[in-house]
């Protein structure tokens, strides 16, 4: 039972924060709001501007408007597709590639279907299967398809050009629109919307079972889970669900070898207090501003403790309190892009993804994909709201078991991202309790080399690796596509350090030798 007395204290604290930190004018579209309705109003306003959230509803459609590829019963309906205007400057022809799109009707739902893309590897059919999950919660994985690591990039004239550094170069690549209501995924009943990682991970596990039943040859391949941002919640829960299914001999055995989290939110208790420290280090705030924000940290930490792993109302209160740290930084940072502090935030998303939305709403594209009349939006506010109580929960708790059972974890983070910064990610990775904690903590950072140049700083011990990526923000595959592809390839080959022995000049003229 949640401690409502302390919850009341937390909500009064949010009122105090709103009146003392000028950041409320940054995070709120309206500069004034009714404090009597603080929790719902504040939460709704925060939703709209904190993390890639246009103000559209989730895809709840009428049965008469079901997509052409909708499954009649639980299972997958998949088709090969060809995008219009895809070949720009040579490269492989569409006939050489296996591009698939489909819907999976969720068995544990009233009328929900998840949309997915599947791109066969350009080179080796026995390459690992990699699934990518975009965060949000409620943001479509098509963001990654067209702007990060998919087979092609969308150009200014709405045509597609081949992506030289698409992850389908080294893997069979899956992108799923999830949770239900995200992107082209839809439901005919609002009761299907998910509110926690249990529902999300069960849906993804059911999808994988159906996908490998549809593609039995791929079930023999190694399998990796990847993603970024709020996928720092999805990925550990999903990996644990797959591992649990394997141990219980449920359905098709999935050869889970590892999972990778890019600029994720995984352990809020260690990541939120990093906001003032990161902002000070990067020159976004002064020491005085840092010290003022530090006074909020203890109550943020206490509110997260109240939230625990299964709280509800207390987790919403924790979200409101702890985001005062983020909003406090932003009130002094001005119009900085919190996904890449080297840039200014332009538009409601800080990035311009409008060409993708226009492209995916073209009738020719819709016909190719078989998605019917579903309106595509990059991110769903309603999905975000539904998952809000999940935000402050700690998803690190299930990771040690996976590491102990030999499943690899790579955490990577672009150095210029504020919202899921490398410092907070480094802290939870180093603090995690597992048998290799001491040795990982003692491991030296070594350069991550791409084409003879340092592309990041790498720390690794046995199954656990942490990579700070140079010259990148929140979306590493977008900012550093070549380094991101090299990272994925080497990680799957268990060779993140390129050579058997790397010698680099360390501070003070000493030499640091990194052994694989």
From Swiss-Prot:
Reply yes or no: does the keyword Transport apply: no
Signal peptide segment:
1-22
Domain of life according to the entry: Eukaryota
According to its UniProt entry, one GO biological process term is: proteolysis
Q: Which PROSITE patterns match?
A: CARBOXYPEPT_SER_HIS, CARBOXYPEPT_SER_SER
Q: Which residues form the propeptide?
A: 23-82
Expressed in which tissues: Expressed in roots, senescent leaves and flowers.
| EC category | hydrolase
Detail which positions bind substrate.
420
Spell out where the chain is glycosylated. 157
Q: Which Pfam families match?
A: Peptidase_S10
Enumerate the active-site residues.
Answer: 229, 417, 474
Q: What GO molecular function annotation could you give as one example from this UniProt entry?
A: serine-type carboxypeptidase activity
Record's keyword terms, sorted = Carboxypeptidase, Disulfide bond, Glycoprotein, Hydrolase, Protease, Secreted, Signal, Zymogen
What EC number(s) are associated with this protein in UniProt? 3.4.16.-
Task: Give each disulfide bond as a residue pair.
Answer: 139-379, 307-322, 345-350
Grouped into one coarse class, the protein's main location is secreted
Q: Name one GO cellular component term.
A: plant-type vacuole
In which compartments does the protein localize? Secreted
Query: What family, per the record?
Result: Belongs to the peptidase S10 family.
Q: What does this protein do?
A: Probable carboxypeptidase.
List the protein's name. Answer: Serine carboxypeptidase-like 49
């Amino acid at each position: 039972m949640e401690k409502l007395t302390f919850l009341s204290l937390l909500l009064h604290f949010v009122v105090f924060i709103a009146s003392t930190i000028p950041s409320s004018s940054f995070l709120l579209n309206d500069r004034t709001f009714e404090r009597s309705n603080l929790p719902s109003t504040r939460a709704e306003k925060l939703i709209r501007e904190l993390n890639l959230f246009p103000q559209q509803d989730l895809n709840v459609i009428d049965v008469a408007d079901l997509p052409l590829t909708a499954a009649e019963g639980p299972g997958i309906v998949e088709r090969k597709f060809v995008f219009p205007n895809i070949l720009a400057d040579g490269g492989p022809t569409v006939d050489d590639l296996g591009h698939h799109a489909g819907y999976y009707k969720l068995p544990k739902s009233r009328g929900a279907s998840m949309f997915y893309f599947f791109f066969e590897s350009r080179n080796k059919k026995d390459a690992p299967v990699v699934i990518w999950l975009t965060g949000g919660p409620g943001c479509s994985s098509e963001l990654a398809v067209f702007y990060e690591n998919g087979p092609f990039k969308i150009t200014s004239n709405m045509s597609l050009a081949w992506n030289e550094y698409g992850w389908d170069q080294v893997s069979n690549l899956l992108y799923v629109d999830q949770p239900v209501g995200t992107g082209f995924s839809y439901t005919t009943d609002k009761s299907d919307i998910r509110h926690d990682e249990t529902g999300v991970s069960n849906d993804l596990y059911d999808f994988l079972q159906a996908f490998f039943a549809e593609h039995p040859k791929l079930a023999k391949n190694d399998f990796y889970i990847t993603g970024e941002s709020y996928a720092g919640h999805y990925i550990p829960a999903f990996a644990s669900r797959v591992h649990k299914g394997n141990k219980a001999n449920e359905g098709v055995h999935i050869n889970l070898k590892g999972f990778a989290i890019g600029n994720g939110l995984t352990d809020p208790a260690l990541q939120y207090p990093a906001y003032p420290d990161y902002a000070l280090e990067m020159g976004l705030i002064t020491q005085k501003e840092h010290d003022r924000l530090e006074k909020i940290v203890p109550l943020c930490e206490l509110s997260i403790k109240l939230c625990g792993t299964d709280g509800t109302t207390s987790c919403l209160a924790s979200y409101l309190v702890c985001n005062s740290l983020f909003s406090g930084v932003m009130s002094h940072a001005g119009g900085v892009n919190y996904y890449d502090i080297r840039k200014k935030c332009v538009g409601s998303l800080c990035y311009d993804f409008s060409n993708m939305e226009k492209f995916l709403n073209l009738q020719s594209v819709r016909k190719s994909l078989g998605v019917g009349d579903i309106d595509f939006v990059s991110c769903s506010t309603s999905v975000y709201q539904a998952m809000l109580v999940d935000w402050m929960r700690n998803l690190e708790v299930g990771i040690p078991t996976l590491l102990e059972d030999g499943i690899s974890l790579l955490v990577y983070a672009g150095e210029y991202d504020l919202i899921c910064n490398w410092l907070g990610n480094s802290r939870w990775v180093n603090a995690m309790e597992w048998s290799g904690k001491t040795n990982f903590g003692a491991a030296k950072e070594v350069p991550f080399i791409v084409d003879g140049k340092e592309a990041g700083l790498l720390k690794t011990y046995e199954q656990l690796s942490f990579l700070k990526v140079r010259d990148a923000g929140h979306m590493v595959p977008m900012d550093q596509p070549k380094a991101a592809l090299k990272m994925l390839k080497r990680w799957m080959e268990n060779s993140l350090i390129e050579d058997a022995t790397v010698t680099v000049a360390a501070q003070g003229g000493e030499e640091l030798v990194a052994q694989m």
